[in-house]
Regions:
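Thiamine diphosphate
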Residues: 1-164, 168-177, 182
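Gly/Ser-rich, acidic/histidine-flanked active-site/gating loops
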Residues: 185
Length: 185
């Protein structure tokens, strides 16, 4: 099995570098979300909001209103728990084309309970107009930007980071399922 180191870093840069309407939004987790290289090479397309997730959601909603497509980067738990009201009012209800890249989904984080996004799917699925996508391997991480950007409305992506195994040959496609194995029951 092939292991791919930081697949999102290259995939996001390749996807966003020539699209002026796509902006990279960061919650002060550039390296942890694998966007530090993009920040360094495309500073005119990079906005650091600091550890101000509530402001980041409202600001990104405004960017969406102005015709931009913000790709918001943070740990999953920080994209919905604290900024919930702003996420609902500025992004979900008005159906802004914001792409929320939530890294360290579930209990994959070494940061303890404050960093665990254990209810993110249930919270995000209850929001109007919100689509939730899940990455399962390096191929899906590499194709998540295109998949998310194909949706007319807000998208929350559960992101893998670091060294990620490659399990699938074909990219993630919205609305298509994968058969992992055939059963007989």
């Amino acid at each position: 099995m092939e292991i791919v180191n930081k697949p999102y870093s290259k995939a996001f840069e390749d996807f966003a570098k020539d699209k002026e309407e796509i902006l990279c939004i960061s919650a002060d987790l550039d390296s942890s979300c694998e966007i530090d290289g993009f920040r360094d090479r495309y500073p005119h397309k990079f906005i650091s909001m600091g550890m101000a997730e509530q402001n980041m959601m409202s600001f990104s909603g405004g960017l969406g209103l102005a015709g931009f497509r913000p790709f918001i980067h943070s740990f999953g738990v920080f994209t919905y728990r604290r900024p919930y009201d702003q996420l609902v009012a500025s992004i979900a209800y008005p159906r802004r084309k914001a792409r929320i890249m939530g890294f360290l989904p579930g209990i994959t984080t070494p940061g303890g309970m404050t960093h665990q996004a254990i209810e993110d799917i249930s919270v995000m699925r209850t929001l109007p107009n919100m689509t939730v996508l899940e990455t399962g391997d390096a191929t899906e991480v590499e194709s998540i930007c295109e998949a998310a950007d194909s949706i007319d409305g807000p998208v929350y992506c559960r992101m893998l980071r670091g060294s990620v195994p490659r399990l699938f040959e074909s990219p993630l496609k919205v609305g298509e399922l994968r058969t992992l194995s055939e059963g007989e029951d």
